[in-house]
């Protein structure tokens, strides 16, 4: 179809939207392109927001049009058009969701708006007729009061039938003077002559009927007043408690200035670390104490070795002064004396090493005992 048809369809759609009082902005470019995202909001507004009676009909059929995807929404709309309005669209569901068929989509939207508006008018017209019938019945019962005065006979005369009953309306009320109503025709004449006055009287009656309820609502009961008093007392108590809490907080802040708060776990960790550092310091001091006697032992060994060498030299000198004959006779003894000196040195050194080994063993035992004691102390601190 030509572009002029698209413009004409858009004009028709604008007219329908005016009848709906559509408050949102319309994406005309999307409608011309055939974008379904431009037409779906209009359809959802016509079904859900325009008329409450239409929404009630949809609920009665068990159809929901909100919180759905585009495909589910179109399926529900086609179901409503088929079941409620007996309307079959030109396009299929898949074609409607495509970005094409702009003129046909606009025509479908216009048809949907027409169907909804027509249905709304039908429902509102039926409701108006029902309300008017109810009002007529009520007004006929209230207005017509048949009475028979004492002076007048029960059978009416011809003159009285020709005269119309006198009706006097008081402002703000529906009370009538006593009238003579002899037939239903007279009642119909009264209703036809004074429709406006009936509507005004009905409004006054409604106002009067509403006013006592309003006064009853505005005047609170004694129970409500007592409840309010109790609530006020509770609020005052809570405010006093809050004041006490604020005072305590201020006192705590003043007392805790310059102080640091630490968790128990962190404090225990710090204590354990301090104990470890102290034990390490003690062990290092004891190691230094152990190293001092070892130095003394080395010095003593050096002194003993120097003494032994001096003695050997002195012995050699004395033996050189002895004559050869004496050397021959006592050569065996010289050899023995020469051989015995290193043996004595070895014996002295072995005794020293044994003493040093014993002292190191004792020291190691002491160190192990100290380590065990420190580990026990650490376990006790962690448990506490």
Curated annotation (Swiss-Prot):
Feature: compositional bias, Basic and acidic residues: 201-210
InterPro entries with a match to the protein in the record: CEP44 (IPR033603), CEP44_CC (IPR029157)
Residue stretches in coiled coil: 221-260, 353-378
Region (Binds with microtubules and centrioles): 11-188
Region (Disordered): 191-222
Subcellular location: Cytoplasm, Cytoskeleton, Microtubule organizing center, Centrosome; Cytoplasm, Cytoskeleton, Microtubule organizing center, Centrosome, Centriole; Cytoplasm, Cytoskeleton, Spindle pole; Midbody
GO terms, molecular function: microtubule binding
A GO term from the CC aspect: cytoplasm
Pfam families according to UniProt: CEP44
Keywords: Coiled coil, Cytoplasm, Cytoskeleton
GO biological process: centriole replication; centriole-centriole cohesion; centrosome cycle
Subunit and partners: Binds to centriolar microtubules.
Cross-referenced PANTHER family: CENTROSOMAL PROTEIN OF 44 KDA (PTHR31477:SF1)
Biological function: Centriole-enriched microtubule-binding protein involved in centriole biogenesis. In collaboration with CEP295 and POC1B, is required for the centriole-to-centrosome conversion by ensuring the formation of bona fide centriole wall. Functions as a linker component that maintains centrosome cohesion. Associates with CROCC and regulates its stability and localization to the centrosome.
Annotated protein name in UniProt: Centrosomal protein of 44 kDa
Annotated gene: cep44
């Amino acid at each position: 179809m030509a572009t002029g048809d698209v413009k004409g369809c858009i004009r028709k759609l604008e007219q329908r939207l005016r009848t709906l009082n559509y408050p949102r902005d319309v994406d005309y470019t999307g409608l011309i392109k055939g974008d379904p995202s431009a037409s779906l909001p209009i359809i959802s507004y016509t079904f859900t927001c325009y008329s409450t009676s239409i929404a009630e009909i949809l609920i009665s059929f068990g159809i929901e049009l909100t919180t759905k995807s585009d495909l589910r929404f179109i399926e529900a709309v086609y179901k409503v058009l088929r079941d409620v309005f007996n309307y079959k669209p030109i396009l299929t569901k898949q074609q409607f969701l495509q970005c094409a068929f702009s003129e046909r989509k606009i025509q479908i939207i216009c048809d949907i708006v027409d169907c909804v508006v027509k249905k709304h008018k039908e429902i509102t017209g039926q409701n108006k007729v029902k309300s008017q019938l109810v009002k007529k019945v009520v007004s006929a019962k209230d207005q017509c009061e048949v009475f028979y005065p004492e002076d007048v006979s029960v059978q009416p005369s011809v003159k009285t039938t020709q005269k119309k009953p006198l009706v006097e309306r008081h402002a703000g009320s529906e009370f009538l003077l006593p009238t003579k109503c002899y037939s239903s025709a007279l009642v119909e004449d009264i209703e036809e002559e004074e429709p406006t006055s009936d509507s005004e009287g009905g409004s006054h009656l409604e106002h009067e009927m509403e006013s006592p309820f309003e006064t009853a609502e505005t005047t609170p009961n004694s129970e409500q007043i007592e409840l309010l008093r109790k609530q006020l007392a509770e609020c005052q108590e809570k405010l006093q408690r809050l004041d006490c809490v604020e005072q305590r907080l201020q006192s705590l802040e003043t007392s805790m200035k310059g102080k640091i708060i630490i968790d128990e776990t962190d404090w225990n960790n710090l204590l354990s670390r301090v104990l470890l550092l102290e034990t390490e310091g003690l062990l290092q001091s004891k190691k230094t104490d152990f190293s001092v006697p070892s130095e003394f032992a080395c010095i003593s060994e050096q002194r003993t070795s120097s003494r032994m060498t001096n003695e050997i030299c002195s012995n050699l000198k004395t033996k050189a002064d002895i004559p050869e004959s004496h050397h021959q006779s006592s050569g065996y003894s010289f050899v023995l004396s020469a051989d015995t000196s290193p043996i004595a040195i070895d014996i002295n050194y072995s005794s020293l090493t044994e003493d040093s080994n014993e002292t190191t063993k004792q020291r190691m035992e002491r160190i192990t005992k100290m380590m065990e004691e420190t580990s026990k102390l650490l376990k006790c601190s962690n448990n506490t």
